[in-house]
Structure formats: structure tokens, C-alpha cells
Design a protein with these regions (language model features):
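Hydrophobic alpha-helical transmembrane segments of integral membrane proteins
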Residues: 9-11, 49, 60, 64, ...
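N-terminal membrane-sensor/transducer module of prokaryotic signaling receptors
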Residues: 41, 160, 167-169, 187-188, ...
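Small-residue-rich hydrophobic transmembrane alpha-helices
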Residues: 54-112, 116-118, 150-172
Length: 229
């Protein structure tokens, strides 16, 4: 008779918990964001419908970019985990650098596309009024301004999870959506109106980027020290 072992279940659950919590966090942020856009959009020239529609489109575009980074991360996790368990820390560090480099290159390509071709990207999802494209293009260029740095956060979250640091992996997965973005999209519109939502994005991205770098450098430094010893 198959009898589950609690210690094994905890280990298995911890590996997927970061992704699970991140998906829940994204849903919560989207709900809050839609309500903020509806409220502040009604007090702007755009009305409430245009901002919500535009943000929905741009969220889909961002999901394409994030799906690629998450795919690279998931493909790298067995490599990180196996070599970390074998104490081959040089390979762990090398694999992490390759993953970050790959995601950064992809992120940079998306960044330039967002900045140079916002009208064409938004137009893929349909037509709209002049105000619709005006808001969508501006939102895409401002909110996604830090796209070139956005690949490091999901890579770092997956990295920490794969080497047995599930709690830190969960924290890293929550940095952008919950710890930084959620408070900013609530606070900024109080002073800047609907524009506050746009500027909350790159600031949250920058903060999550810095935090990911700090924690990753610390852990990679420990591995380097362990190799010397």
C-alpha cells in the first residue's frame, strides 16, 4: 500500500510553491490594478474602459516575454539542483550566469520592441480610437521601461528554489508583484492620477532587480568560498 511520507511531500510542495504563490499574487495585483484603473480612469480624459482594455493587452504581451524566461528557468533548474547536490558549485554558478545572460538578451530585445514599435504591438490585438492607442502606447513604453532587467528576477527565484532555498525563492517570486508593485500602484495614483500606475511599473521592476542581484551575489559568493575551502 502506498503511504505518503510527510518529509517527501514537504520537499515536493516547496519546489512548486514559489510558482503557485506567484500566480496567486499576479491575480491579486490584476484585480487591484483593474479597480484602480477604473476609478482613476473615470477621472481622466481616457475614461475607465480604455485603460482597463489597454492594460489587458499589455499584460498579454508581457506574458509572452515572461513565458520565455520561465521556460529557460525551468530548463535550468535540474542543472542547478543536480550540480548543487554534487557540490560542483562552479557548474552551478556557470549555469546561473548562462541563464541570466539568455534571459537578459531576450529581455533587451523585447525592451527595444516595446520602445520602438508600441503602435504595431498594440495593433496586433485589434483596432481602437486615437485615445486608445495614445494611452496604450504610452503605458507600454513607460510601464515596461525596465523590461531589459526583468529576466533576472524569475531566474533567481527558480535558482534559489532548485538549490533548496525554497523560502528565499518564494520571497524572490513575490518581490515585484506584491512587495513593490502592489503598494506603488495604490500610492502613486493618489498623487499622479492614472499616470501613477504607469510609473509604478519600472520602479517596482528596478527594486526587484536590485534585490535579486544582492541575494544572488551573496549566495554565489558563498559557493565560491566553499570551493576554495
Amino acid at each position: 500500500m502506498l503511504k505518503p511520507k510527510l518529509s517527501y511531500l514537504k520537499a515536493i510542495i516547496s519546489l512548486g510553491l514559489a510558482s503557485c504563490i506567484n500566480q496567486i499574487a499576479m491575480a491579486i495585483v490584476q484585480i487591484v490594478l483593474n479597480n484602480i484603473l477604473r476609478y482613476y480612469g473615470a477621472n481622466s480624459v481616457y475614461g475607465s474602459d480604455i485603460p482597463i482594455a489597454c492594460v489587458g493587452v499589455i499584460s498579454k504581451v508581457n506574458q509572452v516575454f515572461m513565458a520565455i524566461c520561465i521556460g529557460i528557468t525551468q530548463g535550468s533548474q535540474p542543472i542547478w539542483g543536480f550540480n548543487y547536490g554534487a557540490k560542483k558549485y562552479d557548474r552551478v554558478r556557470q549555469a546561473y550566469r548562462y541563464s541570466v545572460t539568455a534571459c537578459t538578451v531576450i529581455a533587451t530585445i523585447f525592451f527595444f520592441c516595446f520602445q520602438i514599435f508600441p503602435h504595431q504591438i498594440v495593433g496586433i490585438f485589434g483596432t481602437g480610437s486615437e485615445l486608445y492607442f495614445q494611452f496604450a502606447e504610452r503605458y507600454l513604453k513607460i510601464f515596461m521601461f525596465m523590461t531589459f532587467a526583468n529576466g533576472i528576477q524569475p531566474v533567481s527565484s527558480g535558482f534559489f528554489t532548485s538549490i533548496g532555498m525554497a523560502k528565499l525563492g518564494i520571497v524572490m517570486s513575490l518581490t515585484r508583484q506584491v512587495i513593490f508593485l502592489l503598494p506603488l500602484i495604490i500610492i502613486f495614483p493618489l498623487f499622479m492620477g492614472i499616470d501613477g500606475v504607469m510609473y509604478a511599473g519600472p520602479i517596482a521592476d528596478a527594486a526587484a532587480f536590485v534585490l535579486a542581484i544582492v541575494f544572488a551575489r551573496r549566495e554565489l559568493g558563498k559557493m565560491r568560498s566553499a570551493e576554495i575551502v
